[in-house]
Design a protein with these regions (language model features):
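Hydrophobic alpha-helical transmembrane segments of membrane proteins
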Residues: 1-92, 102-267
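Short helix-to-coil transition segments within interhelical loops
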Residues: 97-101
Length: 267
């Protein structure tokens, strides 16, 4: 760990990441194969030969896989802390051995979780971009004898990127979108990080709060799907879930810090 106690939570976050990176790699690898199979399956169907790439993401179920991956990443990122609190890891990894302010433990776990979420978003963007050309080639091959014209793959990709709400989720195109999803990412990462510092019924309560917070993010994403931009109507519809998410994040911090001070996860 670094010598400066002010920034030691960065080292803790890096340590946590190293402990769960294999699980994250397995998760993302399996999801990549599943999404590829779903997209190629739809692209090879004549009924979807003229379907836009954006519509394929929705029709094939690739978007659902993406949502599941984000939720699973939140769980996988907590594995080191949950193992430590249950005594299923090396004795050196325990709350009593961290000689740093307790808030830095929470900050480090939150940062490690947020990094995993960012990695999942970057992976998803890369997968969707990378699969576009082979999927488009399959569509063109299937529809070649039924249509007398084609649209360049590059043009279709640009149109999908410019108009698709799926791409807007993984690569926000406006300052409002970047700020919105940065806030949601920070809040849900914090809520997930608090689960591992509790035990017993408090852990169950923290898990429920994290689940509700994740549900709020899903609702916000749904509002974004049905809105054009971030106008007044969007903020009216998304105001309630965003408020609940913010309140949950604020309420979760005192309880988590108290649990850390009591060393509830130590054995």
């Amino acid at each position: 760990m670094v010598k400066s106690s002010r920034f030691r939570f960065f080292s803790l976050a890096a340590w946590n990441w190293r402990l769960y990176r294999r699980g994250a790699a397995v998760l993302l690898g399996a999801a990549t194969l599943l999404e590829a199979g779903l997209l190629f399956g739809c692209a090879g169907n004549l009924n979807f030969a003229a379907t836009s790439y954006d519509a394929l993401l929705s029709t094939s179920g690739a978007g659902v896989v993406f949502a599941i991956v984000l939720g699973a990443t939140l769980v996988v990122a907590q594995a080191p802390l949950l193992a430590a609190s249950s005594g299923k890891t090396r004795a050196a990894y325990t709350i009593l051995t961290f000689r740093l302010p307790r808030w830095q433990i929470l900050a480090g776990q939150t940062l490690a979780t947020a990094f995993g979420m960012l990695l999942a978003l970057a992976w998803q963007a890369a997968v969707w971009f990378g699969l576009f050309w082979p999927v488009a080639a399959v569509q063109d091959a299937v529809a070649g004898r039924y249509f007398g014209f084609t649209v360049s793959a590059a043009g279709r990709l640009w149109w999908a990127f410019a108009t698709s709400p799926w791409f807007a989720l993984v690569l926000p195109r406006t300052p409002e979108g970047c700020g919105l999803w940065a806030g949601c990412l920070a809040a849900v990462s914090l809520l997930a990080a608090t689960v591992g510092v509790h035990r017993g019924w408090r852990r169950l309560l923290a898990f429920c709060m994290a689940a509700v917070g994740s549900g709020c993010c899903v609702l916000v994403a749904g509002v974004q799907f049905g809105s054009e931009g971030f106008g007044p109507l969007f903020w009216v519809r998304a105001g309630a879930p965003l408020t609940v998410l913010a309140l949950l994040a604020v309420l979760a911090v005192p309880g988590a810090l108290l649990a850390l001070h009591r060393a509830e996860m130590a054995k």
